[in-house]
Swiss-Prot record:
Mitochondrial membrane ATP synthase (F(1)F(0) ATP synthase or Complex V) produces ATP from ADP in the presence of a proton gradient across the membrane which is generated by electron transport complexes of the respiratory chain. F-type ATPases consist of two structural domains, F(1) - containing the extramembraneous catalytic core, and F(0) - containing the membrane proton channel, linked together by a central stalk and a peripheral stalk. During catalysis, ATP synthesis in the catalytic domain of F(1) is coupled via a rotary mechanism of the central stalk subunits to proton translocation. This is ATP synthase subunit alpha, mitochondrial. PANTHER family: ATP SYNTHASE SUBUNIT ALPHA, MITOCHONDRIAL. The gene is atp1. Its main location: mitochondrion. It comes from Dictyostelium citrinum.
Length: 519
């Protein structure tokens, strides 16, 4: 149309129009053939580098999130900013070897890692390489190369959560049931026992070992990670666990990539029809790492200086946790993201984002922790949106009454400090509430089998513990558990109680257990 307008304006004869049109097409074809974009767009050159971020020219057709290699430096990076004349790239490693003029090569793919069953019992870095000194990981027939950025399972591939994911923590399994394929946020201030609940859940899978556990340490101290690995090894849980580590001394891009690497490993087992549990410890540090990268890339800051897409980096990660249906192997990936709050403020930007993404949250309070209530779970602010759909028949029956009793206790406990003239009913509710809280206390790294959990909840709902002094409750609980373990028939029943399809709260075996112990 432009050529026709020019011809009309210059009064060129109509008969010569076709000749000019053919000539124009030829010139355009030659120009397109020799344009700089098509001569070479696979290599670029570093223009400048600062604080782990480089500007590169020449990579005109690179895609966002694409992996690049710094030629001859044994370093990789990822393209995050696509600008008119340059590309903003973050470096995965130390930037001391990078300088102006270094050649950058496109890898024409996103970051990918090799995943296999041989990773079980190992400690790996963000790139999937072992860092535990136990030798290299060898490829096998089942080894798969998987991109760390993968699409979440679609709607038709999913199935509703209905299988229980037992944590071994009485308070969680009874009041906040978690299912396989669920995303349950663990949130609270620093030093309130967030990681302890997640680690207990890993230790509790030792009973049947049908769940592969992945622990992702984001921005943690090396000494903390070492203690965790040693504890898992001592308890015999490391053999079914994979630890993905990006410590506080690692560059921000490595801390940013760590959860996606761990999720990819979990998806490998989920797609094989197995069940996996992944712990992200913690996503607050993950968000801070992404904020650091974004500010260095000169992206516009938003609320609390986080970039506008900080919600998306967490939603696309957590949506990958799912329960698949029969057509896709019935596998599941359960996620326990951990978020740290400041002075109990759950209305901050990152906590509210992740609360809106997940299927419930376990809220831990500093005040409860300081009172000696461990785990320091605030049952009123905590919720599991899956509910009793993922609970066994036994726990469903027993926990229903427990929730009501605790709700009544919380309501009356507020007024207890203002008035000492309570009636007999109120006094009884307060006494039973204190007893229940005492029995729900549990030490770290000591998960309890579901049968024993059910027995203790049954015992606290009857008169066996009612007349005990609160200071003696924990000791009496230990004696009862020891007695059940010593009687083979009781121990066998407790071991298979989770499989019971129908349960009567006045079950004769549970009653017999308690009566036999009292005698």
């Amino acid at each position: 149309m432009q050529l026709e307008r020019i011809l009309t304006e210059t009064n060129i004869e109509r008969s010569k129009f076709k000749q000019y049109k053919v000539l124009s097409k030829y010139i355009n074809a030659v120009a397109k053939k020799y344009t700089l974009n098509n001569v070479s767009n696979k290599y670029g050159k570093v223009l400048f580098i600062k604080d782990g971020v480089v500007k590169v020219s020449g990579l005109s057709q690179i895609k966002i999130g694409e992996k690049v290699e710094f030629v001859g430096k044994n370093l990789f990076g990822m393209a995050l900013n696509l600008e008119a004349t340059s590309v903003g790239i973050v470096i995965f490693g130390e930037d001391t070897a990078i300088y102006e003029g270094v050649i950058v090569k496109r890898c024409e793919q996103n970051f990918a890692i090799k995943v296999d069953k041989t990773m079980l019992g190992r400690v790996v870095d963000v790139l999937g390489q072992p860092i535990d000194g136990l030798g290299e990981l060898k490829d096998t027939k089942t080894t798969r190369v998987m991109s760390v950025e993968r699409k979440a399972p679609g709607i038709v591939t999913r199935k509703s959560v209905h299988e229980s994911m037992l944590t071994g923590v009485k308070m969680v399994d009874a009041l906040l049931p978690i299912g396989r394929g669920q995303r349950e946020l663990i949130i609270g201030d620093r030093q309130t026992g967030k990681s302890a609940i997640a680690v207990d859940a890993i230790l509790n899978q030792q009973v049947n070992k049908d769940i592969v556990c992945i622990y992702v340490a984001v921005g943690q101290k090396k000494s903390t990670v070492r203690r965790l690995v040693e504890m898992l090894n001592t308890k015999g849980a490391l053999e079914y666990t994979i630890v993905v580590v990006s410590t506080a001394s690692d560059a921000a891009p490595l801390q940013f990539l760590a959860p996606y690497t761990g999720c990819t490993i979990g998806e490998y087992f989920r797609d094989e029809g197995k069940h996996a549990l992944i712990v992200y410890d913690d996503l607050s540090k993950h968000a801070v790492a992404y904020r650091q990268m974004s500010l260095l890339l000169r992206r516009p800051p938003g609320r609390e200086a986080y970039p506008g897409d900080v919600f998306y980096i967490h939603s696309r990660l957590l949506e990958r946790a799912a329960k698949l249906n029969e057509k896709y192997g019935c596998g599941s990936l359960t996620a326990f993201p951990i978020v740290e709050t400041q002075a109990g403020d759950v209305s901050a930007y990152i906590p509210t984002n992740i609360i809106s993404i997940t299927d419930g949250q376990i809220f831990l309070e500093k005040e409860l922790f300081n009172k000696g209530i461990r785990p320091a779970v605030n049952v009123g602010l905590s919720v599991s949106r899956v509910g009793s759909a993922a609970q066994s028949a036994v726990m469903k029956k027993l926990a229903g009454a427990l929730k009501l009793e605790l709700a009544q206790y919380r309501e009356l406990a507020r007024f207890e400090q203002f008035s000492s003239n309570a009636d007999a009913v109120t006094t009884q509710i307060l006494k039973k509430g204190k007893l229940t809280i005492e029995l729900l206390k549990q030490v770290n790294n000591n998960p309890m089998a579901v049968g024993m959990e059910a027995l203790m909840i049954f015992a606290m709902s009857t008169s066996y513990f009612q007349n005990l002094d609160l200071s003696l409750v924990r000791a009496e609980e230990a004696k009862l558990l020891q007695y059940i373990h010593s009687v083979s028939s009781f121990k066998l029943y407790a071991a298979c109680v989770d499989a019971v399809k129908a349960f009567n709260p006045k079950d004769t075996v549970f009653t017999e257990m308690c009566q036999s112990y009292v005698k």
